[in-house]
């Protein structure tokens, strides 16, 4: 792929982001180096790795809840990465034509840290944005999947116009460090809880029925989003070791109007992802690695995807 083709690809990605129903799948790679990957943790077995990972996620997320923020350099880099990414998503939604596609982006993440929530909270202090984490309630908030299908509009002070407010929907199938089981429901709290609702990354085989039901309900919600016409899914930081999510993506690709772009961290990742998925590329399913996007990318991260999407102009929405 020559330089001209690479620039054309970037333009195409920007165009899809503003003209299609926008979806993201964000995996644990996006929170590195603040939170290590499972394979980076020195331990005797997966059980010990899961335990050490959970402690690190709880510690890091606890720091994100403090005011003022006091973060290490690694934590600060990751937080600002998420903050910039979500700010660009908001800008894309503001440019989108709500008569063609909803001003909504779905963020589906297997991470159970609070980087996204903290970044969203920071953005909402200055910008108009609806954040939908699926919760219902005020003082006591419970997760309910029926809450995901909401759009919010601003009708003007004199009811003289209706303007859809941009919204970001967060779907967390692996749970979160601020989720607590309460009377067979999931309560979302503003603190790190003692026994959080978390699906361990090594799989669902040993999980209790309550967690298993939550996981598959969240998958169902996301599957419905990907089945919608004129949709695009960008995947970053995710290696498809979760077979359930991999199966969901392969099924979703059967929707001919869905475009899936998976971004690999390194040039070797394409073969790894395809092997994990037991799948092949096709017209609406592409895996992009650093060499596909430009010589300036030694690796490809969430911040690099942010940079590509942030270059959008109205010119990008026009047909070539």
Language model regions located:
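Short, conserved loop/helix-junction motifs that constitute active-site signature segments
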Residues: 91-101, 162-165, 251-257
């Amino acid at each position: 792929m020559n330089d001209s083709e690479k620039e054309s690809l970037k333009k195409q990605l920007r165009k899809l982001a503003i003209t299609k129903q926008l979806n993201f799948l964000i995996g644990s790679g996006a929170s590195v180096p603040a939170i290590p990957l499972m394979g980076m943790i020195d331990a005797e077995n997966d059980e010990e790795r899961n335990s050490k990972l959970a402690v690190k996620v709880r510690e890091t997320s606890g720091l994100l809840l403090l005011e003022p923020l006091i973060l290490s350099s690694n934590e600060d880099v990751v937080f600002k990465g998420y903050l910039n990414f979500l700010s660009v998503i908001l800008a894309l939604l503001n440019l989108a034509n709500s008569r063609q596609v909803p001003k909504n982006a779905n963020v589906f993440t297997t991470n159970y840290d609070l980087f996204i929530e903290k970044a969203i909270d920071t953005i909402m202090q200055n910008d108009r944005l609806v954040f939908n984490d699926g919760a219902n309630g005020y003082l006591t908030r419970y997760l309910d999947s029926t809450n995901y299908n909401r759009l919010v509009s601003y009708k003007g002070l004199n009811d003289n116009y209706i303007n859809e407010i941009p919204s970001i929907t967060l779907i967390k199938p692996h749970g979160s460090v601020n989720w607590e089981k309460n009377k067979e429901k999931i309560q979302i709290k503003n603190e790190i809880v003692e026994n959080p609702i978390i699906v361990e990354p090594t799989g669902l085989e040993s999980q209790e029925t309550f967690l298993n039901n939550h996981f598959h309900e969240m998958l169902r919600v996301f599957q419905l989003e990907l089945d919608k016409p004129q949709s695009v899914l960008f995947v970053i930081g995710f290696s498809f070791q979760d077979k359930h999510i991999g199966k969901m993506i392969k099924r979703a690709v059967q929707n001919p109007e869905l475009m899936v772009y998976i971004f690999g961290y390194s040039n070797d990742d394409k073969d790894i992802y395809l092997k994990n998925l037991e799948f092949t590329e096709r017209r609406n399913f592409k895996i992009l690695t650093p060499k596909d996007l430009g010589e300036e990318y030694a690796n490809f991260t969430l911040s690099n995807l942010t940079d590509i999407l942030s270059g959008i102009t109205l010119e990008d929405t026009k047909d070539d």
